[in-house]
A protein has these predicted regions:
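Electropositive polyanion-binding surfaces
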Residues: 23, 163, 173, 179, ...
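Charge-lined substrate channels and their catalytic hotspots, especially those that engage the 3′ end
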Residues: 1-272, 281-327, 358, 366, ...
Length: 703
């Protein structure tokens, strides 16, 4: 019936009543008419139709100003409706009773093609509020519940039975039973995460808030019992023996789930690069609970020092991990690369290896940067230097075609044994880290190119062209801020974006400007539609190299086995993959964003926790953002805090087109990129808040 309704309304630009629609359907029985009404309401909830106050229906796509999507509310109380091609901003005054996570219909107030369209919530189509994370609090003489998410402006009444075992301060997950009033819900406690003062509960609470599963089901645990701890002789049949090759791994000091190993030979003018990836698909097979669990999670989550794996540690740290001096099953991509960094030949095949050594970035960087050879690395020093040569060649080739290096630093939180943040250090991408990145990109491109040439259904990692208007807005903004732009932006290509970024690379405020440009661009996603990867300047790109921690990589391995190793390219297989991979791509993109948001929330919380011990201390920072309510300042350790406008000396006006605050007498101006000195005045772990004030001299002037 839905298809018939869509056909009827396809050409209609005005709303149609049920009777109007039924004139074309010729339904006569009351039962059929009731079914029609139910179908129309269902299609409205799904966002296919718009229903007016007069109960008239039209296709949503035929309306000029209506869109549907999930509402995401940020800390400021404002929201964004996730729509294609652009998210729509919704001011807190225009939410119309909608809460974070609602599926809504939004009416656009500005033009649809505006760089940042704005709208208001017209209808709440679906409220998918099932579970909420929060804290058990004292409510007079009884126990109550307070959601951790302040954006969820709701009241909750808990059933008495479910409160058994709960005490004040417990972090819990509740199940919503039903809505019993406007934004008021009856619920029950589903799970006690732990007491808020217990080590690690803060991180597990954020994981729960993002619906990240921290435990595996009994069904998964049962399947694990049938997976061996060692590779058998039978497993080696049909695989190429690479155990005599000089193959090793390079990872962080504390890495336990090792899924990539490398090898290299310099043969005349060319290099032979081997990238050998753990064959997780040999153990996590379609149709198993392990596979379904991996699909559901989509990715491993790295929350400070807590790893929540996509597959159980028994596999990720065991038989799937390329540990040294043990035989492991792999899928190898061996490439012949010329002196210009071009792949001139390659082979992709099932293999087995025995890693010679588990190396660390720290020790590899000593060899490559300082020519110091740590103990135990002597047999590998020459090979590492050859790898360095090849990595330099590959990087130069990437840069020549427009590879964009945003140079964004990342933080690492150091915690004590009780899980308290005691230090923040920058993750430095040294020579070894860049080497591995270059090798993995080469393998990912080679695998993607091969399947693309076969014209078979596949899952790609894609990055669309940036919106020209957003790039123009960025350049106009930085010009207003006083920066000169020499790059010709008439045609936006990776090379022009690279040139634009390089104009600021030597400036102190480069990281801030780079981040602003990055936010002007679209996000990389997974897709079956191969549009290339703009940021990498790649025509074909996929994720092949991390099947332990990313479901798309696991899927790519399964497809390689199907298409290349088993030669199953029949129409049934092709048709199945064509449909199934769309779901994999969409779900994987969603779980990736969710994991990144959880990681960001943990980082913000731990930064605030760290700064609680540094209230009253002075720091130098750079203004990273300017709003009508103050300045955001980023310190050298990447902690960002707010200097509220009320703490500034005098009256200031916000100039949005210049991202500046200017004093009433025009003598003082604060803009993005300015260096300032601040003092920490407040830090709150629960709210993930850090507040600063500008440091002043004896005359009241900021330094």
């Amino acid at each position: 019936m839905k298809d018939k309704i869509i056909e009827i309304l396809k050409e209609e630009t005005k709303g149609q009543s049920i009777n109007d629609i039924n004139k074309n359907l010729h339904l006569k029985s009351m039962e059929d008419i009731n079914m029609l009404e139910d179908t129309l309401n269902e299609m409205t909830t799904e966002g296919i139709l718009h229903k007016s106050k007069n109960h008239e229906y039209m296709l949503l796509e035929n309306t000029k100003s209506l869109k549907v999507g999930k509402l995401r509310i940020n800390k400021s109380g404002n929201g964004f409706v996730e729509c294609k091609p652009e998210d729509i901003f919704v001011h807190s005054n225009d939410l119309n009773g909608a809460i974070n996570g609602d599926f809504v219909e939004v009416e656009i107030k500005t033009r649809l093609n505006d760089p940042e369209p704005e709208g208001y919530i017209r209808n709440i189509l679906k409220r998918d509020l099932k579970k909420v994370v929060g804290e058990i609090v004292k409510d007079k003489k009884t126990l109550g519940f307070k959601p951790d998410d302040e954006k969820l402006n709701i009241a909750v009444k808990l059933t008495k039975e479910s409160l058994k075992g709960c005490v004040e301060g417990h972090k819990v997950i509740i199940d919503i039973i039903k809505e019993i009033g406007n934004r008021t819900f009856l619920a029950k406690v589903e799970k006690i995460i732990g007491h808020k003062n217990d080590p690690g509960v803060d991180i597990l609470t954020i994981a729960a808030k993002h619906s990240i599963e921290t435990e595996f089901s009994e069904a998964v645990k049962e399947e694990l019992k049938n997976i061996p701890d060692e590779v058998s002789e039978a497993d080696l049949i049909g695989r190429t023996d690479l155990t005599n090759e000089m193959i090793f791994t390079i990872d962080g000091d504390d890495t336990k789930d090792i899924d990539d190993a490398i090898s290299v030979e310099h043969t005349g003018k060319n290099y032979k690069l081997g990238v050998h990836i753990a064959d997780v698909s040999n153990y996590v097979k379609v149709g198993t609970n392990l596979y379904e669990s991996a699909f559901s999670r989509g990715t491993s989550s790295y929350l400070a020092d807590t790893v929540i794996p996509m597959i159980p540690h028994q596999l990720s740290n065991g038989i799937c991990s390329l540990n040294p001096e043990v035989v492991r099953l792999t899928i190898s991509c061996v490439m012949t690369i010329d002196g210009n960094g071009k792949v001139i030949d390659y082979d992709i095949f099932p293999s087995y290896i025995k890693s010679r050594k588990q190396m660390t970035y720290k020790n590899v960087n000593k060899i490559l940067d300082e020519n110091i050879i740590p103990e135990g690395y002597e047999p590998f020093a020459d090979t590492l230097k050859t790898m360095h040569e090849l990595a330099d060649i590959l990087r130069k080739e990437k840069i020549s075609r427009g590879y964009i290096d945003f140079g964004i630093d990342e933080d690492k939180i150091i915690q004590d044994k009780n899980g308290k943040a005691i230090d923040i250090v920058k993750r430095v991408q040294g020579t070894g880290e860049k080497l591995i990145e270059d090798f993995m990109i080469a393998a990912n491109e080679t695998v993607a190119t091969h399947i693309s040439n076969m014209d078979l259904p596949f899952i790609y990692r894609v990055h669309d062209l940036p919106n020209a208007e957003k790039i123009e807005d960025f350049t106009n903004l930085i010009k207003q801020m006083g920066y000169q732009v020499h790059t010709n932006l008439n045609k936006i290509t990776p090379v022009t974006m690279q040139k634009l970024l390089n104009e600021f690379r030597d400036k102190d405020e480069f990281v801030i400007l780079s981040d602003m440009l990055l936010r002007s661009m679209k996000k990389a996603i997974y897709s079956t539609n191969n549009i290339g990867h703009f940021g990498l300047a790649s025509k074909n790109y996929t994720h092949f190299t991390s099947p332990i921690r990313r479901f798309p990589d696991l899927t790519v391995h399964r497809l390689l086995r199907t298409y290349l190793f088993e030669n199953r390219i029949d129409m049934e297989t092709i048709n199945f993959n064509a449909k199934y991979l769309i779901d994999v791509a969409e779900h994987s993109s969603e779980t990736e964003v969710n994991a990144i948001e959880a990681e960001r929330d943990v980082l913000d919380m731990k930064m605030a926790e760290y700064m609680m011990d540094h209230i009253g201390e002075e720091y130098t920072g750079i203004i990273s953002g300017v709003t009508n309510f103050g300045l955001f300042v980023e310190l050298d350790n990447l902690v960002e805090g707010l200097v509220h406008i009320s703490t500034l000396n005098g009256y200031f006006t916000y100039i949005p087109e210049m991202l500046s605050l200017i004093s009433f007498d025009k003598k003082t101006k604060y803009r993005v990129g300015d260096k300032v000195k601040v003092v920490v005045t407040n830090a709150n772990k629960e709210g993930a808040i850090v507040d600063f004030e500008l440091v002043r001299d004896t005359n009241g002037n900021s330094k």
